[in-house]
Amino acid sequence: MKPKILFIMHMPPPVHGASMVGQFIHDSELVNSSFDCHYVNLSVATRLEDVGKGGWHKAKGVLKKLMEVRKAVKSVKPDLVYITPNSAGVPFYKDFMTVMMLKMMGQKVVMHFHNKGVETRQDKWLDNWMYKRYFKDVKLILLADALYEDVKKYVKREDVFVCPNAIPAISNANQVTENSDHVPHILWLTNIMKTKGIMEYLSALKILEDKGMKFQADFVGGLTKEMSGDEFDSALSMMGLNECCTYYGPKYGDDKYSFFSQADVFVLPSYTEAFPVSILEAMQFALPVVASNVGGVSAEVEDGVNGFLLGGKQPVMLNTFRPDAHEIADKILLLLSNPNLRYNMGKAGREKFEKEFTLEVFEKRMVEILSNNVKC
C-alpha cells in the first residue's frame, strides 16, 4: 500500500511562484504514482491584488479553510502532511493556526517554504513565541542552502532538506543565437511593485538612455496595490522613458514565452526574493540575468557566469536591501555593449537550467524527500 500524503498547498488562482509549483506537484505523474495523494488548496485569495490583505471576508475564508483541512485530515488519515505555509506577516499568523491544528491532531508535518522573512520578525516577542512552537517537531524544505540563514534560530540543519524550484521544459526555448543586428530588448517579467525594484530600474533605464544607448524595455506583469497604472505611467513620463518602454500587462503561456524569445537581457532588481521562478524561465530561454543577490537567487545566478548579481557576493536575507540604479545600469550596459558576452552567459544559464532546474529533477528530489520523511 502506498503511503498517504495530504498536500496542503497554494494552487492557482492567483498565479505566483508558489502556486505554480503547487500545480506542478498536483499534476506530477511521478508524485501521484509514488504516493496516495490528497490535495487541499491553501489559497484564500483568488486575485493577485488580494494576496496579503486582511478584512472580514478574508477572515471567514481562513476559518472555512481550517475546517476544510480538519475534515481532510480526519477523512484521509495521512501518513504525512505536506504544507506550504508563509514565514512572516499576516499570512504567517493564518498559517500558524493551520500548522498548530495539524500538530494537535497528531500529524507528521513537512513544511515547504517558498518565501522568507523569519529573520525579520524573530526579535518580536510574539513572533518569537509563535516561531518556537511553529517549527517544533517539523521538517523543512527550503529552496536553497542560503535560505537556512533565515530559520537557523529555530531549526536544526539536519531537519532541513533543499529542493529548488523548477519549471516544465519548453520545446522551442533552446535556440541560443548570436544576433547583434537589432535593437536589444530588456525584459521585466514580474508584477509592477516598488518592492521589485521598479523605481530603481526605471532610474537605471534613464541612465542608459542619457548615455545614448538604444534599447527597448518590455514590462510584463500585473499592477498591484503598490503601484497603480497611473503611477507607473506618471513615472515613465517624468523620466522621459515613454518612447523606449512599453507595458503589456500580465501574460501567460505562449504569450509570455514570446517575450522571453525576443528578449536579450532579463532583469529582476528586487528588494527581497526567495527563489524566483521567472529567473528559471529566463535561463531556459538562454537569457543573461541581472538580479539582486537576495534570498536564494545566488543558487540560480552565478555572478559573472550566467548573469550578474546586484549588491555584493553575500546573499541578503533581511528586507533592507535596495538595489543601486547605477549598478543596474552598469551591468545592463555591459551586456548591451557586448553581444558575445550575452550569448556566452545565456548559453551557460541554459546549461545550468537543464542540469539543475527541470521539472524532472524537481520531481525526483521531491519524491525522495517525501519518502524519507514518511519512513522516519
Task: Indicate residue ranges for each PLM-predicted region.
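Conserved donor-binding/catalytic core segment of Leloir-type glycosyltransferases
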Residues: 6-8, 177-206, 217-220
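Donor nucleotide-sugar binding/catalytic pocket of nucleotide-sugar-dependent glycosyltransferases
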Residues: 132-174
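Short alpha-helical donor nucleotide-sugar binding micro-motif in glycosyltransferases
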Residues: 250-251, 258-263
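Aromatic "clamp/platform" in nucleotide-sugar-dependent glycosyltransferases that forms part
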Residues: 271
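Short hydrophobic beta-strand element within catalytic cores of glycosyltransferases
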Residues: 288-291, 301
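A short, well-ordered alpha-helix in the C-terminal region of glycosyltransferases
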Residues: 327, 334, 341-355
